[in-house]
Amino acid sequence: MLHIADKTFDSHLFTGTGKFASSQLMVESIRASGSQLVTLAMKRVDLRQHNDAILEPLIAAGVTLLPNTSGAKTAEEAIFAAHLAREALGTNWLKLEIHPDARWLLPDPIETLKAAETLVQQGFVVLPYCGADPVLCKRLEEVGCAAVMPLGAPIGSNQGLETRAMLEIIIQQATVPVVVDAGIGVPSHAAQALEMGANAVLVNTAIAVADDPVNMAKAFRLAVEAGLLARQAGPGSRSHFAHATSPLTEFLEASA
């Protein structure tokens, strides 16, 4: 079970809603993934109508919605978007995203910390998308964020855990859940994140752009379950030397 703020989730896989060929395919993939927390960009939905093509099927699916502030370039813009989302969707949960450069979509650490502190004070449950910076993640935790969401690689790049060394430090020092977000490209990346101690992963592009998104979503579900189970089972330690799994000479000596 995964506990974040006032909610509990059975699944350690969070999913997004972008880049799918259709709303139907999006919903089928989310169901196949087993995900119970789904992000959606406020700029992509009509907040005035719950029969929006993206919003309506998500509400019907019964998942927890995590609106994000993707598109915001400053703390002020993100705070404004957060209040719109809370008013329209009736949730104080928020994925905080601030990336001023559309080419790289890297999170702005200064604006993110500033917005996070304000939003927490205003009663939001803040899950910030941030760089894999252990110092920043600790500061975000200290201002009251319910979890931290450091990137594995740039958004949509499918490069995997390029920031692994920093992620390990973040995980080791965190007292709130760590959700690896962005860059996860194949199920094995997700399994590795859970094995190394992450509490969850958020996957969007890798599922949405696959030739078969529904089966890819299933693969990610199984990978996350496997990674979590492997961590709980306690992997053996690594070694630079070979260690025989059975005696090498006893049977020869016995037959001599």
UniProtKB/Swiss-Prot annotation:
Gene Ontology CC: one annotated term? cytoplasm
**Record's catalysed reaction(s):** [ThiS sulfur-carrier protein]-C-terminal-Gly-aminoethanethioate + 2-iminoacetate + 1-deoxy-D-xylulose 5-phosphate = [ThiS sulfur-carrier protein]-C-terminal Gly-Gly + 2-[(2R,5Z)-2-carboxy-4-methylthiazol-5(2H)-ylidene]ethyl phosphate + 2 H2O + H(+)
Q: Which GO terms describe its molecular function?
A: thiazole synthase activity
Q: Where in the cell is it found?
A: Cytoplasm
Catalytic site positions: K95
Q: In which pathway does it act?
A: Cofactor biosynthesis; thiamine diphosphate biosynthesis
Which parts of the sequence bind 1-deoxy-D-xylulose 5-phosphate?
Answer: G156, A182, G183, N204, T205
For this UniProt record, the keywords arranged alphabetically read as follows:
Cytoplasm, Schiff base, Thiamine biosynthesis, Transferase
Q: Does the keyword Transferase apply?
A: yes
> Key word Transferase present in the record?
yes
Q: What is its EC number?
A: 2.8.1.10
State what this protein does: Catalyzes the rearrangement of 1-deoxy-D-xylulose 5-phosphate (DXP) to produce the thiazole phosphate moiety of thiamine. Sulfur is provided by the thiocarboxylate moiety of the carrier protein ThiS. In vitro, sulfur can be provided by H(2)S.
The entry assigns this protein to a family as follows:
Belongs to the ThiG family.
Description of how the protein assembles with itself and partners: Homotetramer. Forms heterodimers with either ThiH or ThiS.
Q: What is this protein called?
A: Thiazole synthase
Please name the source species: Escherichia coli O6:H1 (strain CFT073 / ATCC 700928 / UPEC)
